[in-house]
Amino acid sequence: METFLFTSESVNEGHPDKLCDQISDAVLDACLEQDQDSKVACETCTKTNMVMVFGEITTKAAVDYEKIVRDTCRTIGFVSDDVGLDADNCKVLVNIEQQSPDIAQGVHGHLTKRPEEIGAGDQGHMFGYATDETSELMPLSHVLATKLGARLTEVRKNGTCPWLRPDGKTQVTVEYYNEKGATVPIRVHTLLISTQHDETVTNDEIAADLKEHVIKPVIPDKYLDEKTIFHLNPSGRFVIGGPHGDAGLTGRKIIIDTYGGWGAHGGGAFSGKDPTKVDRSGAYIVRQAAKSIVANGLARRCIVQVSYAIGVPEPLSVFVDTYGTGKIPDKEILKIVKESFDFRPGMIAINLDLKRGGNSRFLKTAAYGHFGRDDPDFTWESGEAPQVGQTSS
C-alpha cells in the first residue's frame, strides 16, 4: 500500500496574529449587535506594549474600541508584561474611517438595494472543502492540530498546567493512503507542540505534562504507535511570547482558519469583515456546499470554488471537483449545487444569518478554525444545509 505524509499546523488564541484576528472580530460583533447593516473592514496589529485597530467602518453602533481591545486581550490571558502583553496598561491606538462612498454605492447603493441586488464587496475567489475522513468532514491533520491548540488553552485556563502562558503552536503530520481519490488516515507520524511557558518549569516537566494532559485527551490511541515522533518544545525555551515575542496582524493565519493546507485558498482573510465581504461569506457558503455534497453521499471528498466581481451580485463562476470520488459525474453535482445554493452575497447573509453579531458570535470563529465546529452560531456548518441529491448507492 502506497502512503503519503501530510502536515497541518495551528496556533492557539494567544498567538499574536490570532490575538489580532480576535480583536477584529470582537469589533465586528459589537457593530453588528447594534446595527446589522454595519459595514466593517477592521484590521488589528500588535507589538510590544501596543495594539492598533484601524480600517473602514460605517455603522450606527456606538463602539468603544479601546474597551474591546483591552477586554479581548484580558480574556485571552494577556494580563501582564511577563506573559507578553498587559491588557490594562498597553497603548491602544485607533484609526477608523468610514467606508469609501465609491464602494458603498457600488456594493449596496448606500443601503438602498434589496438583498438580492447587493453586489460583492470586492472581486475574488473562494474555496470550500470537505472530506469523509472525520465526523466533522474535515481533514484529520487539521482537526488534530486545531484540537491540540484548543486543549493547550483549556489546561492553561483551568489550572491543570499553571506553567503555561497564552502563546503556542501545534503541528501534526498524518500518514495517509489514497483510496481512489479519497484520503484515508492511517496514523500520526509526527506531533509537534511549541508552547509558551513560565520560568519555573523544566523541559522534562513540559514534555510530561503535554503528553498526559494535552496529547492523550486529544489524539485517539488508534493513531499513535511506537514509531510516532514527538517534538515537544524542541527549541528548549519559550518564555517570551505573545506580542512581546512577535508582531501580530489580522489575516495572517488563513490556512489555519480553513483546511490546514488541504483543498485550496483564494487568499482572502475572514476576521473583521462584515458579510458583504465575499472573502468571508463566499468562503462560508462554499464550505456548506462542499460539506453537503459529502454529507449526502454524492462524493467522499470535494472542493467547491466560487468567484465574484465587485458590485455584481451573481457569481462569475462556480466549480466542483470530487477528486474522482463522485457517485455521479462532477458536472451533474455542479448542476445540483447551483440549484441548491444561492451564491449572491446579500442572500448568503440572509440564509446563513451572517448579519447577527453579539454573543461573541464571530469572535468564536477567530481562534481554532472557522469550519468543522459544532456550534449553532456556525450556521454554515449546520444541518440546515440544502439536501443536495441524497444517494444511498
Curated annotation (Swiss-Prot):
Its main location: cytoplasm. This is S-adenosylmethionine synthase. Its cofactor is Mn(2+); Mg(2+); Co(2+); K(+). Pathway: Amino-acid biosynthesis; S-adenosyl-L-methionine biosynthesis; S-adenosyl-L-methionine from L-methionine: step 1/1. GO terms for molecular function: ATP binding; metal ion binding; methionine adenosyltransferase activity. NCBIfam families: metK. Keywords: ATP-binding, Cobalt, Cytoplasm, Magnesium, Metal-binding, Nucleotide-binding, One-carbon metabolism, Potassium, Transferase. It holds the Pfam family S-AdoMet_synt_M. L-methionine binds at residues 56, 99, 246, 277. It is an enzyme of class 2 (transferase). It comes from the Eukaryota. HAMAP family: S_AdoMet_synth1 (MF_00086). GO terms for biological process: one-carbon metabolic process; S-adenosylmethionine biosynthetic process. Transmembrane segments: none annotated.
